[in-house]
Every structure is written in C-alpha cells, then in structure tokens.
C-alpha cells in the first residue's frame, strides 16, 4: 500500500499520468511494466543484471515501448516517502557495477521479482511442475492424490489474485464435498 505494490492489475489505475518503477527482469516484471504504460506517463524497469530473463517476444515488445526506460545493473536500496499522506516520492537505487547510489523521483513502486509457491511441504507427495506449482487434473482442483485439492497461489501461476484464489477455493470445496459424500 501507500505507493508500493506487487500487482499492476490491482493498483495501476492509481498512477494515471504518474511516474512508476517496476523491479524485476522476468516475464512478470516485463508484463507489469507494459501493463502500467496504459496509465503511467513513464515506467522505469529496474533490473539487477544487464540482460532480462523474460521471453524474447516480451523483451522485443518492451524495448519498442517508448514509455518504458530500463535501468540496468541496479537494485532498490531505499524507498523514500511522505508520512502525511503516506505515499512514495522517490527511491534510492544502487548501480551494482559502480556502487553509485542515485535518488530517483517516482510516484509508485511495483515489485515483480518472482513468486515462489509455498509448496515445499508437499514435495515428493503431490505432483508439481518444475517451478513448484501443484498440478491438478484437467478442469479440476484435484491433485494426484484422491481427496486432496489445490487452489490459489499454490496452483495459479498466471493471475495470483484473491478473486481467482477464492473461485478456485470454492471449486475445491465443492469437489471435496462431492468426494466425501461418495
């Protein structure tokens, strides 16, 4: 809140004609940055390396977008804001090659440095993809173990929204009720 977010879809519209920064270099960061150009006057993508990890097609679209500036080899050191009203007014970024720290005026900061599902507990018990997300049967929330269901951020690597998690939770509850009644 108060100008720091992990969800451009949720909070992007608060930054109409403002300057925002996105931290990250993968698909999520590039997609967030491109989405934010619908609202923000300028989007600064801050990445700690000198190359992006995002898919090549996404990188091409990003590079073609005139509203996006990429700040390479850098990391956010500090978020600077006001207390009344609470909001972001700048960040301090450190160039990881030169160690030089600069202050950059922004109105919002979006964190998109990856999402790891909290599934380590289920390793070697439930089937997972290579990123650790639980796998379910097609059009279902049922896992490889009958009576065990997956919903929300442990299964959904695309949207990661409360509303989609709630919908999946409802599906899982209905499937569990059906399983228990048979």
Task: Go through each PLM region and give its residues.
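Glycine-rich dinucleotide-binding loop and its adjacent helix/turn
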Residues: 1-39, 136-138
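Residues at secondary-structure transition points
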Residues: 2, 27, 53, 159-160
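A conserved FAD-binding loop/helix module that cradles the flavin
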Residues: 30-34, 145, 151-182
